[in-house]
A protein has these predicted regions:
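Membrane-interface alpha helices of multi-pass inner-membrane proteins
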Residues: 268-275, 306-322, 328-333
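Perimembrane helix-loop-helix junctions
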Residues: 89, 292-309, 325-358, 430-432
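Membrane-interface helix-loop-helix junctions at transmembrane boundaries of multi-pass membrane enzymes
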Residues: 9, 83-90, 303, 342-350, ...
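Short acidic/glycine- and proline-prone juxtamembrane loop motifs at membrane-interface regions
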Residues: 272, 276-284, 461
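Interfacial juxtamembrane loops and adjacent helix segments
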Residues: 114-173, 177-230
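Membrane-lumen/periplasm interface segments of specific transmembrane helices
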Residues: 21-38, 330, 334-425
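Hydrophobic, aromatic-rich transmembrane alpha-helices
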Residues: 1, 70-83, 409-435, 441, ...
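Transmembrane-helix motifs of polytopic, lipid-linked glycan transferases
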Residues: 71-79, 206-214, 230-254, 288-290
Length: 514
């Protein structure tokens, strides 16, 4: 896809983005409007007491400097990526190094950003989020495992539990992958004193403070659990920021290096990632985006092995959460679209489909034969139990109000500037007349639109749709293609300012203090 001549964003779009961003900040900080649907679900605001105003100010300055440095790295890298004079081998090596540097800066920036928040809301919340059943529950269940067979039996019993309250919570609505992943992390810390000691030596003071409040029988949790909780936090954060790599590769299939860099850089400034770390939802974008990149690359450039690998990664994702079902729908939609446009003939489509089916079916069959786990039955039960969640009287939901709220919530969670770029890119793609450009636009719009209208996520869309948010970076690429350097810098500044306003005010969890 050939980029257009560098130009600025339309004045009307700039006015809309700035106005919407300022309005968002005003509503969050100067009003007490409910962040959700009253009486059903809403997000809590982070309170900045008058007695702690000075600490809040210092935290805001730290967050601002951190986001400024991340934005500067994104801007500087964009200039370097635009250079084409280096020899090819050196150029590829330099770009790979820059991309790894972007991930490293994102990881460090996320740490500093979370450290800037008040106690109980930033980095110190991580052990509470991962340990307590109310906010997660996967680790809590994993630490009770005495053997894999016992876990299998208890897990299958919960799926069919007659008590709907127990059946519709984490254990009954999720496949066993997350529980087993936390078990693996805990076992690594239990069996290796070196790993345990190294992880504990990296713990910030606020994390140690928070862990000291987690009591079992009046005693603090043992070092094994303290290390496992912090290691799981670090791995989740690294996985979240590393999503920039598959975003870069996905955009690079059809766009120049600089555009791919810009799209990847924007991922580090998505507010939802910082708000919901270290929830498991932050793990999903890496797997989901890598799968889409491999599938789209196989469609555009060929390679059956890519389709097999993409399906295998999606299978891993489905073992973690049914949230990966839209990824399958998107991949199928892309293949069908390109076939209909004559860019992916029937023979190629058949081979791609068989390769994808093999990547999904073979590990499913292997689990059934070796572990006696019928994943198809488990996924079906998870789906039914999740649907039953909204039938419980303590979880009332109204369909129509959530349609509007979810749109607003998604725009703020992604970041108003990025959401505006995605909308602009969507319109450009739809009007381009190029099947390769219009395909991702139509399929992303169709899959997300059906998910939105289905009402499957009435509440917490900002968290539950995290694995779909890289699509905004992908769609925005069509606008980023022609964005001149000055406008790119201003856009980064606006996105960073919105992150500062949202992350400093919105809590993704219903607890505070300590």
């Amino acid at each position: 896809m050939t980029p257009n001549r560098p130009s600025g964003l339309p004045v009307a779009l700039w006015i809309a983005l700035v106005t919407a961003s300022v309005t968002t900040a005003v509503v969050l900080w100067l009003t007490d409007w409910t962040l959700g649907v009253p009486g059903e679900w809403s997000w809590e605001r982070i309170v900045h007491p008058a007695a702690s105003r000075w600490d809040s100010l210092l935290g805001g300055l730290q967050a601002g400097l951190t986001l400024g440095c991340v934005g500067l790295a994104a801007w500087f890298g964009s200039r370097l990526m635009a250079r084409q004079s280096q020899p090819r081998a050196l150029s590829q090596l330099a770009r790979a190094a820059l991309l790894l540097g972007l991930v490293a800066s994102g990881f460090l920036g996320m740490q500093l950003l979370l450290h800037s928040l008040p106690p109980g809301h930033g980095i110190g919340r991580s052990p509470w989020v991962l340990y307590y059943p109310g906010s997660s529950g996967y680790y809590y269940e994993a630490r009770k495992v005495t053997s894999l067979e016992d876990f299998r039996q208890s897990y299958l019993e919960v799926l069919e539990d007659p008590d709907p309250h127990r059946r519709t919570l984490h254990l009954g609505t999720h496949p066993p992958g997350l529980f087993l992943a936390h078990l693996a992390v805990r076992e690594a810390c239990r069996r290796s004193a070196a790993v345990r000691d190294l992880v504990l030596s990296w713990q910030p003071y606020r994390v140690r403070q928070a862990q000291a409040t987690i009591l079992e029988g009046g005693r603090p949790i043992p070092p094994v659990d303290a290390a496992a909780l912090w290691l799981a936090t670090l791995l989740t954060q690294l996985t979240a920021v590393a999503t920039a790599i598959p975003i870069y590769l996905l955009v690079r299939v059809d766009h120049p290096y600089r555009t791919a860099w810009r799209a990847a850089s924007l991922w580090l400034l998505v507010p939802a990632v910082a708000i919901f770390l270290p929830k498991s939802d932050c793990l999903y974008p890496l797997l989901a985006t890598t799968s889409i990149w491999l599938w789209w690359s196989a469609i555009r450039k060929g390679g059956h092995s890519k389709a097999v690998l993409a399906a295998g990664l999606t299978w891993i994702g489905l073992c973690l959460s049914l949230a990966f079902l839209p990824i399958l729908a998107l991949a199928a939609g892309l293949a069908a679209w390109m076939n209909r446009q004559g860019r992916f003939n029937r023979k190629q489509l058949t081979a791609w489909s068989l390769a994808s089916l093999a990547g999904l079916a073979l590990p499913t069959l292997a689990c059934w034969l070796t572990l006696d786990l019928n994943l198809l039955s488990i996924w079906s039960s998870n789906f039914v139990n999740h649907a039953a969640f909204y039938d419980q009287p303590q979880h009332p939901r109204s369909y129509l109000p959530w349609l509007g709220v979810n749109l607003l919530e998604l725009a703020i969670a992604v970041g108003i500037p990025l959401a505006g770029l995605a909308a602009s890119g969507l319109l450009r793609r739809l009007g381009s007349g190029q099947p390769e450009a219009a395909g991702p636009a139509w399929t992303c719009l169709a899959v997300w639109g059906l998910l939105w209208l289905s009402g499957k996520n009435m509440g917490e869309a900002a968290r539950l749709w995290l694995l779909l948010m890289p699509w905004a970076c992908w769609l925005a690429a069509s606008t980023l293609d022609s964005l001149r350097s000055r406008d790119w810098a201003l856009l980064l500044a606006l996105q960073a300012a919105l992150v500062l306003a949202v992350v400093g005010r919105v809590s993704g969890f219903d607890f505070a203090g300590g």
